[in-house]
């Protein structure tokens, strides 16, 4: 059975995302922010069943998977795979400057 391990930084970022989404009024109800982040957690926990690709740059993990949360936002989850363990190293989205470094051969 596969095991999903999230680094503390990833958990912190997702927990902070709940507050950011609500405070910046992306969602009118805090419950909607919780649901949005829970959907990301659900996706992460399904990593073993998903098609994933090698990252172009290994700084934050060997592999990545993309999760399309809505028509405007795609999340990129990077991880290492060690046997039956998936170790989630980092999460970012297409609204950041850093995400192309995971999916293309851009020099850092």
Predicted regions span which residues?
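Enriched for short, Lys/Arg-rich terminal
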Residues: 67-108
């Amino acid at each position: 059975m596969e095991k999903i391990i999230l680094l503390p930084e990833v958990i912190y970022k997702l927990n902070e995302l709940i507050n950011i989404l609500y405070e910046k009024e992306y969602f009118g109800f805090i419950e909607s922010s919780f649901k949005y982040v829970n959907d990301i957690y659900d996706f992460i926990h399904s990593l073993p069943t998903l098609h994933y690709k090698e990252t172009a740059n290994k700084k934050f993990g060997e592999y990545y998977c993309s999760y399309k949360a809505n028509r405007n936002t795609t999340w990129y989850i990077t991880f290492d795979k060690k046997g039956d363990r998936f170790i989630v190293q980092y999460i970012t989205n297409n609204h950041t400057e850093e995400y192309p470094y995971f999916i293309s051969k851009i020099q850092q």
